[in-house]
Regions:
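An alpha-helical repeat/solenoid feature that recognizes helix-turn-helix modules
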Residues: 1-176, 180-219
């Protein structure tokens, strides 16, 4: 279902999510077969992260704007490129894919104390906003909300402390944002960008309802 001839983080996330939530079905099955190569999966995830301590590819940047965040696949960012403080071309980290990376680490059962998880969490807190998908504007905004809810929920994050010391109740803020964006017919749609099918009401409504359901459950 992709025009690329290789893996990307979004499709990897989808596969890992399916395996994570079905793992109990095969745990004790005598004919379960060979387990996933989790080491290779984690290596691919970290190879999409702007974090030189764990990703040795030449494009990786540890500049303050990008360190810890994620890109779509090794060597490609949907947010494009930018010059860092040293004049070097950096692949820009962006919001939705960074939550995808954080969530992928969760499905691979990396603890929140792992430096890779801590690094992406720090980038996401630094760039926290509900007004846009960081570095992508309105593009993929509801997918950003959806992944934010899943990633912060699975890691048990109740409050976010921003760099200025302000504490944010992200569940309350996101719930209010989503309820305020609901259309008269009960649906949701991205009014500002059609990219990634966010002009399609069924898809965006699903993102929104799943997010609200997880927020309501609180865990």
């Amino acid at each position: 279902g992709t025009r690329y001839s290789h893996s990307d983080l979004n499709n990897t996330l989808t596969a890992l999510e399916a395996l994570y939530y079905s793992r109990h079905l095969v745990k004790d099955a005598p004919d379960a077969g060979k387990d996933l190569n989790w080491k290779a999966a984690i290596e691919f995830i970290q190879n999409c992260q702007n974090l030189k301590s764990h990703n040795k590819q030449p494009w990786v940047s540890d500049d303050p704007e990008n360190k810890g965040g994620f890109i779509y696949f090794p060597g490609k960012s949907m947010a494009g490129v930018a010059k860092d403080a040293n004049g070097r071309t950096a692949l820009r980290s962006y919001g939705s894919i960074s939550y995808a990376g954080m969530l992928s680490y969760a499905y691979a059962q990396l603890d929140k104390s792992d430096p890779r998880v801590k690094a992406v969490r720090e980038w996401l807190i630094k760039n926290y906003t509900l007004e846009e998908n960081p570095a992508m504007g309105a593009q993929g905004l509801y997918y950003y909300y959806y992944l934010m809810t899943k990633a912060l929920t699975i890691y048990g994050t109740d409050m976010l402390e921003l760099p200025n010391g302000k504490k944010v109740d992200w569940r309350k803020d996101l719930a209010l944002k989503l309820m305020g964006n609901q259309a008269q017919d009960g649906s949701w749609v991205n009014q500002k960008s059609a990219r990634w099918w966010e002009s399609e009401k069924p898809l965006v409504t699903a993102y929104s309802l799943i997010s609200l359901s997880l927020i309501h459950r609180g865990q």
